[in-house]
Design a protein with these regions (language model features):
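Short, charged, low-hydrophobicity "junction" segments
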Residues: 1-6, 38-41, 45-47, 55, ...
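Intrinsically disordered, low-complexity regions enriched in small/polar residues
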Residues: 6-9, 33, 64, 215
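Substrate-binding cleft and catalytic face of glycoside hydrolase catalytic domains
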Residues: 17-178, 184
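Short, low-complexity, polar/charged sequence segments that are solvent-exposed and flexible
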Residues: 7-12, 85-89, 142-144, 198-200, ...
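Glycoside hydrolase catalytic-domain groove-lining segments
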Residues: 12-15, 160-161, 168, 172-182, ...
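Short, acidic/polar
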Residues: 2-20, 52, 102-112, 188-200
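Proteins with a high burden of low-complexity, intrinsically disordered sequence enriched in S/T/G/P/A and R
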Residues: 1-3, 58, 62, 96-100, ...
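Short, glycine/charged-enriched secondary-structure capping and boundary segments
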Residues: 6, 41-42, 80-83, 137-140, ...
Length: 267
């Protein structure tokens, strides 16, 4: 397995290293059931509720706040894929049952984290939901986009119903926690249109979040730092706070494995 060391070369816990160097807030990804029919995990850390609770227990020892990131999926949920959890598949065409699933899972999970002493400061309802969530997504084969989900009155109402179900659970279980809605995009027009749909459907949230990968696809111009200020100002104009939900950076430009790097010496 992976081992972590402090700056003195002593093997120790990753969370201790982070805490000792000023990190006071961590984001825990939550998947519903990241296993196949044989019980084998899909990979990616197998971040189900049980795995998240183990992280939360240790984080509590270091007085770290938690951001719980609900994907409402068994694996990665992002702009390309927002697949319904296996256990909810039978309810795909029943909007009311799906809302109940979201509410119940969110509430039950938050309670479990509270029982292990987690300090929940923020809850993210959905992950990178730019194009939709829970299988309400554009038909890319027909050239559809986010406008066919969030810009479609019927779809937007259903999607916002799911968001409100999750948010209701958060408000009931941990009323002091901030509710975050997270898009991958930093496109001003796109973000504004989606926020319009939330507003028109009465979605109650505190923080607008985006991802920020400056060299995504090797192109820094699409994700320049100036864009962050524009999106922050957009959030403020709607009475919301703004936060970067995802980012990363490299520690070396060198090639380590002979496969192409997203960012390399050529950049």
């Amino acid at each position: 397995g992976v081992k972590y060391y402090d700056f003195d070369g002593k093997e120790t816990s990753l969370l201790k290293v982070l805490h000792d160097n000023g990190v006071n807030y961590i984001r825990i990804r939550i998947w519903n059931d990241p296993t196949n029919e044989k019980g084998e995990t899909y990979g990616g850390g197998a971040n189900d509720v049980a795995a998240g609770l183990e992280i939360a227990k240790e984080a509590a020892q270091y007085d770290m706040k938690l951001l719980l990131d609900f994907h409402y999926s068994d694996f990665w949920a992002d702009p390309a894929l927002q697949k319904i959890p296996k256990a909810w598949g039978k309810d795909k065409n029943d909007t009311e049952k799906m809302k109940q699933n979201v509410y119940d899972f969110t509430k039950d999970t938050i309670k479990k984290f509270q029982e292990v002493g987690a300090d929940i400061g923020m809850v993210q309802v959905g992950n990178e939901i730019t194009n939709g969530m829970l299988d309400i997504m554009p038909d890319y084969s027909k050239g559809e986009t986010y406008k066919d989900t969030w810009g479609n009155a019927k779809n937007a109402k259903i999607l916002c119903g799911y968001l409100k179900a999750g948010i209701k659970a958060v408000r009931e279980c941990t009323p002091k926690a901030l509710v975050t809605l997270h898009l991958e995009s930093m496109g001003y027009g796109k973000c504004s249109e989606i926020m319009n749909a939330w507003e028109q459907n009465g979605v109650d949230y505190d923080v607008f979040g985006s991802s920020f990968y400056q060299f995504w696809q090797g192109n820094s111009s699409k994700n320049a730092l100036a864009g962050l200020q524009k999106i922050e100002n957009l959030a403020k104009s709607r009475g919301k706070m703004y936060a970067v939900m995802e980012t990363s950076w490299l520690n070396s430009l060198k090639d380590a494995d002979g496969t192409p790097n997203v960012i390399g010496e050529g950049h």
